[in-house]
A protein has these predicted regions:
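Active-site ligand-binding patch in enzyme domains
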Residues: 51-198, 207-210
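Short gly/pro/ser/thr-enriched loop/turn and capping motifs at secondary-structure boundaries
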Residues: 17-20, 43-44, 112, 139-141, ...
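Zn2+-dependent cytidine deaminase-like catalytic core
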Residues: 1-44, 130, 213
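Flexible, gly/pro- and Lys/Arg-enriched active-site loops
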Residues: 214-252
Length: 271
């Protein structure tokens, strides 16, 4: 269409990372005598399309782990109560991140304890993100609210009767065990990439958060930090092992920090 329109110059922010078509369009334009420039604001373009770039170059979605925490780094009281640590503005902002995601990933423990829908609320959106559950032992209740949203459940054991019951209620079950009898998280991300998922928002508990972090599968942290202190007995964001050397600490790069209502929002890339 551009060639037929007779344009004299085309400026592209970046080449298409899809290996099937990468650069071919720009090559065709140049062959037709059109002046072509690419790379203008490329970093910004990649940031806008971070999920698609991830899927094209790594075969898996961009994984963004969202956490709402206190100033002392706690995500819930020791009894599990966490509603609400952050204020209404932060919660609305979090729904905007859900809206831009292809799926919201959680674990069985969150489904059991909170029975979330993982849907976008109070924001207009053309589609809802798909709920994805890591449930190694296939224990998701048949009454779970997210089944109505066509949940995709990853399990480590095959139970034909339970799978059939979950499928009847609208879910899809994929069995992907690792050698330890748990869900193979890396294989799960590759499967999600094959299904066309670009960005995944993780809203899970400390155990799944820790597993994803330990395996190096988290690309970015989305942290909402509220001006409140919950004390040393409250729960943390991830059940990670104790470090004895600072050199072993996971380093992050903060890319954005701003106030959302009374809470602070931090975006950080994992190095």
């Amino acid at each position: 269409a551009l060639i037929a329109a007779g344009v004299a110059r085309v400026v592209a922010a970046m080449k298409d990372p899809n290996p099937l078509v990468a650069g071919q369009g720009l090559t065709q334009l140049a062959a037709a005598g059109i002046a072509v420039t690419s790379g203008l604001l490329e970093a910004e373009a990649r940031a806008l399309n971070v999920g698609f770039v991830s899927r094209m170059t790594r075969g898996r979605p961009w994984l963004r782990l969202k956490v709402a925490m206190s100033l002392d780094g706690k995500t819930a009281l020791n009894n599990g109560v966490s509603q609400w640590i952050t204020g209404p503005d932060a919660r609305t902002d979090a729904h905007a991140w859900r809206a831009r995601s292809c799926a919201v990933l959680t674990g069985f423990g969150t489904v059991r304890d909170d029975d979330p829908r993982l849907t976008v609320r109070d924001i207009d959106t053309p589609r809802q993100p798909r709920p994805v559950v890591v449930d190694s032992r296939l224990e998701t209740p048949l009454t779970a609210k997210l089944l109505v949203g066509g949940a995709l459940i990853f399990a480590a054991r095959h139970d034909a009767e339970k799978i059939n019951a979950l499928t009847t209620r609208g879910a899809e079950v994929v069995v992907l065990p690792n050698s330890a009898g748990k869900v193979d998280l890396a294989a799960m991300l590759l499967e999600l990439g094959c299904r066309g998922f670009n960005e995944i928002l993780v809203e899970a508990g400390a155990r799944l958060n820790a597993s994803l972090l330990r395996e190096g599968l988290v690309d970015e942290l989305l942290i909402y930090q509220a001006p409140v202190l919950l004390g040393d007995k409250a729960r943390g964001m991830a059940d990670l092992p104790e470090l004895v050397e600072l050199s072993a600490a996971q380093r992050l790069t903060i890319t954005d920090r701003r106030m959302v209502g009374v809470d602070q929002r931090i975006l950080a890339l994992l190095n």
